[in-house]
Amino acid sequence: MDVNPTLLFLKVPAQNAISTTFPYTGDPPYSHGTGTGYTMDTVNRTHQYSERGKWTTNTETGAPQLNPIDGPLPEDNEPSGYAQTDCVLEAMAFLEESHPGIFENSCLETMEVVQQTRVDKLTQGRQTYDWTLNRNQPAATALANTIEVFRSNGLTANESGRLIDFLKDVMESMDKEEMEITTHFQRKRRVRDNMTKRMVTQRTIGKKKQRLNKRSYLIRALTLNTMTKDAERGKLKRRAIATPGMQIRGFVYFVEALARSICEKLEQSGLPVGGNEKKAKLANVVRKMMTNSQDTELSFTITGDNTKWNENQNPRMFLAMITYITRNQPKWFRNVLSIAPIMFSNKMARLGKGYMFESKSMKLRTQIPAEMLATIDLKYFNDSTRKKIEKIRPLLIDGTASLSPGMMMGMFNMLSTVLGVSILNLGQKRYTKTTYWWDGLQSSDDFALIVNAPNHEGIQAGVDRFYRTCKLVGINMSKKKSYINRTGTFEFTSFFYRYGFVANFSMELPSFGVSGINESADMSIGVTVIKNNMINNDLGPATAQMALQLFIKDYRYTYRCHRGDTQIQTRRSFEIKKLWEQTRSKAGLLVSDGGPNLYNIRNLHIPEVCLKWELMDEDYQGRLCNPLNPFVSHKEIESVNNAVVMPAHGPAKSMEYDAVATTHSWIPKRNRSILNTSQRGILEDEQMYQKCCNLFEKFFPSSSYRRPVGISSMVEAMVSRARIDARIDFESGRIKKEEFAEIMKICSTIEELRRQK
């Protein structure tokens, strides 16, 4: 970047420059190796926070379980998970008292969701623990495998396509004495290559049937697989995150639907809204506290931090909350919602890949899988790892650790927010019955607390009371990491508030630049990011113009498409110069074909092809966008595509950009090395799954796509649709009689084949 950074700060108020102190430029740190150590840390820490609870043994799986609920009240400031049931229930009751009908209405909304949600809801999401293969898979594949196994074991309620019916199968599967599954495995054999006469290793993929008894199946159904969270900025240590299997996901989805519906009605909740809507919500709470404190009162704000939010939460507490929230509802509904917390109370954490050992002297590397940690001699490990393993051993079963207390990251964000808000809600004067009162904001584990009181002593007393109330429900405000300021300056979910929200522009820095999808998408995403930041993040016109120039420069270097009249020599310059010389209207060439950049900050919303269309030579137009040109990628032309952009914190968010299909919208091919591994069988399944879905979409384009109702299979739906369409086309003269007859014949053949099968 050839920009003098000090120029950016000449007229910037100091508080607006906060964003430059964030660790958000450059590449974020990624983890390498296994997450086994981090997972053991999580399991051990969680048990330590609840160590004075009661130990029991799960009768089905034999797993030892620790229950800290209603445990001893804390006597010091150490984080602890001893939530008191009666306190949580009382907080819920007060929340309902100050928001009459909130639980009732949310239950009604959720009941509707439960009855309408289709099972394909579970295909959203990235990596999911696939219990049939005992490893992670894309969500759609994991769901397909689960349903396939269910059907081969006689569980067929899921065929209706409703999520609730799939969950009925899940419940039934847990009562079965055994489940039969298909697993992939790999055979290696040495054979002599005919051509080279050398010995080579041949790998073949096999599928084999395996029976799981009730105990093994339950352990798998209750397992969360763990991985290391990547790309976390500003931290020295990595940490583990969990991905649950398909048995748990559906139940969690409904619980979160209920909690989301409640959060939407709570003014202190930072979820589920985001962006500008969230800022408006927060500004309202601040305004309320400041107006009320004008003359007589002091008002202070704590930028809060909770210690290990997830590890001190407890699924048993969530069960109590759900039982209370749904207390007047039908029995079936209460049962469906109580299953997720019950499963989480019995969860098992999979320890991941295990440890890698290498001997420098003998040049040997060997993997110690997690399953062996229970029995292996500890002399091979260093001190810290040895301590971890010793501590976790009593909890181990088949390479998974029993983890009853605690919630893994990101599982019940909405429900835990409801718990946090219920404590903020207790700050009203009518509840504190004294001169101080509080309010605040809660978004998952992040909070901001605003305390008003006539004097400093009152403020202190209010903060203390809040702190102690939180302890009673298993929330541990960190005294070291929270800080207090006069109201008007605080930070909440990385929004900085100083008499209004300051744009924290550095958060967006990682999403500037060339994404690396293809020339067409990258150009479109790049300008859309700049446009969005002008709208949402105070990116001023001069800086935006500069960002645009830097982006174009970056883009040209990435794709080696410098202007046709430049002196820069690259691998592509010969072809680009040739095109430049034979083009009459040079302004019409796309930047990726060596053309000039016509973007400025006024026309960022127009796709480049549209911007230059009138300027293009006719034959160039014909090559660029011709559907008959084999290089034009034509997935059905959607006018809008989705890109995944990485903001600096939080999950990758999806961003829409305009997509025009041209010769530059190529799709890179899959890496071939996967084809030689045991995952090949899985990849083939995935491709078959993909092909079926694509075919189905051809028959039911999204404009007319109402889900086929009734029990018909995908094939039946497609055949009947083909017949209807063919008849309409024949009667309106769009197709000839022979074509019509041929289509009908194909349809009959397909039905005949299905009958024989």
Swiss-Prot record:
Catalytic activity entry: RNA(n) + a ribonucleoside 5'-triphosphate = RNA(n+1) + diphosphate
Family matches, as InterPro entries: RNA-dir_pol_NSvirus, RNA_pol_PB1_influenza
First-level EC class: transferase
Enzyme Commission numbers on file: 2.7.7.48
Residue ranges of domain RdRp catalytic in the record: 286-483
Polar residues: compositionally biased ranges: 55-64
GO cellular component, one term: host cell cytoplasm
Organism domain of life: Viruses
Short motif (Nuclear localization signal): ranges: 187-195, 203-216
GO biological process, one term: DNA-templated transcription
UniProt PTM: Phosphorylated by host PRKCA.
MF term (GO), any: nucleotide binding
Gene3D superfamilies per record: 6.10.140.720
Region annotation Promoter-binding site: where it falls in the sequence: 249-256
Keywords annotated in UniProt: Eukaryotic host gene expression shutoff by virus, Eukaryotic host transcription shutoff by virus, Host cytoplasm, Host gene expression shutoff by virus, Host nucleus, Host-virus interaction, Inhibition of host RNA polymerase II by virus, Nucleotide-binding, Nucleotidyltransferase, Phosphoprotein, RNA-directed RNA polymerase, Transferase, Viral RNA replication, Viral transcription
Region feature Disordered, mapped onto this chain: 52-82
Cellular compartment(s): Host nucleus; Host cytoplasm
Subunit structure: Influenza RNA polymerase is composed of three subunits: PB1, PB2 and PA. Interacts (via N-terminus) with PA (via C-terminus). Interacts (via C-terminus) with PB2 (via N-terminus); this interaction is essential for transcription initiation.
UniProt family annotation: Belongs to the influenza viruses polymerase PB1 family.
Role: RNA-dependent RNA polymerase which is responsible for replication and transcription of virus RNA segments. The transcription of viral mRNAs occurs by a unique mechanism called cap-snatching. 5' methylated caps of cellular mRNAs are cleaved after 10-13 nucleotides by PA. In turn, these short capped RNAs are used as primers by PB1 for transcription of viral mRNAs. During virus replication, PB1 initiates RNA synthesis and copy vRNA into complementary RNA (cRNA) which in turn serves as a template for the production of more vRNAs.
HAMAP family hit by this protein: INFV_RDRP (MF_04065)
Protein name per its UniProtKB record: RNA-directed RNA polymerase catalytic subunit
